């Protein structure tokens, strides 16, 4: 009976956190929409990206503490019970929005994972959960964050279960992760946010040719994911070696991004660049779209901007 009560308590806590995560995801996504509208109204906003980079670096250095570890501390929290700073969620929310506002090429999944993991980790600690129960709550928070921020609760559930232990699923977290991912997404949609929907007009026959192309694409995408993680790693390493002052490194890194946007006309690659999915589905993608987005994103994140999904070298998302 005690074990059943503990399981119920874990599930109830996870579900309550997922409702809050749904609210946060709604607010976060609306802020990103407002940032995109601002960039459309003021196309030259990227000239202030170096200022945003300096402020971000300064705040994280002075009051961020372990928050600067980003997703890695969430992974350690789920696996080893590492304490997550309470300020992590608010810092990554605010500075991701600022980066988007001034034209940085960053995403939303890294921010969502950090917010969801930070929220559930601190709630679990406050309520006295330990070991596997605590880990399950944190994993459900990651699932609810991913599912609600993308509107993909099924994928979010698996992401939460697998992201902390690449290649293996946490069996005890299956029900909480699925329930929380769907509930958080329901809350986000209930509040009125409309996620993008990408219709597949026709499904090809599952024959040998399709399987071959599918496997080749999977290998290529895995390699691109690996190159993305390595790109961020080595850009960060280069800046740290060239510039001893962290504020100067952030300023120069952001300035390079701004100059590239200006010189090459890369305004369309600022922020999320969700238009790229639409052109891909329509078959209208240009050959330079992917390299341009890759370059701008790696340089933005390498300069120190938040909202990244780069994990430890042996646990990158490209290994999933």
Regions found by a protein language model. Give the residues of each.
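Alpha-helical transmembrane segments and immediately membrane-proximal extracytoplasmic
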Residues: 1-318
């Amino acid at each position: 009976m005690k074990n059943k009560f503990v399981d119920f308590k874990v599930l109830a806590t996870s579900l309550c956190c997922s409702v809050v995560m749904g609210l946060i995801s709604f607010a976060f996504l609306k802020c990103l929409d407002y940032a995109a509208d601002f960039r459309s109204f003021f196309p030259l906003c990227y000239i202030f990206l170096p200022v945003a980079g300096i402020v971000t670096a300064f705040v994280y250095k002075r009051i961020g503490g372990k928050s600067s570890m980003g997703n890695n501390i969430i992974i350690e929290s789920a696996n080893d019970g590492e304490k997550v700073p309470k300020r992590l969620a608010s810092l990554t929310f605010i500075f991701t929005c600022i980066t988007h506002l001034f034209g940085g090429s960053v995403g939303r999944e890294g921010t969502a994972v950090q917010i969801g993991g930070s929220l559930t980790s601190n709630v679990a600690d406050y309520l006295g959960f330990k070991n596997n129960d605590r880990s399950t709550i944190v994993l459900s928070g990651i699932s609810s964050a991913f599912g609600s921020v993308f509107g993909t609760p099924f994928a979010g559930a698996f992401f939460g279960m697998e992201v902390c232990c690449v290649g293996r699923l946490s069996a005890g977290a299956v029900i909480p992760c699925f329930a929380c991912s769907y509930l958080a997404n329901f809350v986000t949609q209930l509040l009125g946010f409309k996620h993008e929907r990408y219709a597949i007009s026709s499904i090809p026959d599952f024959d040998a040719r399709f399987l071959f192309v599918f496997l080749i694409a999977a290998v290529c995408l895995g390699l691109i994911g690996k190159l993305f993680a390595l790109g961020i790693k080595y850009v960060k390493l280069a800046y740290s070696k060239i510039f001893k002052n962290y504020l100067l490194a952030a300023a120069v890194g952001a300035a390079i991004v701004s100059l590239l946007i200006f010189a090459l006309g890369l305004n369309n690659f600022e922020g999320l660049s969700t238009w790229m999915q639409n052109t891909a589905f329509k078959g209208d993608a240009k050959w330079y779209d992917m390299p341009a987005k890759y370059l701008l994103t790696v340089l933005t994140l390498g300069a120190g901007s938040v909202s990244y999904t780069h994990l430890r070298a042996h646990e990158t998302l490209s290994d999933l």
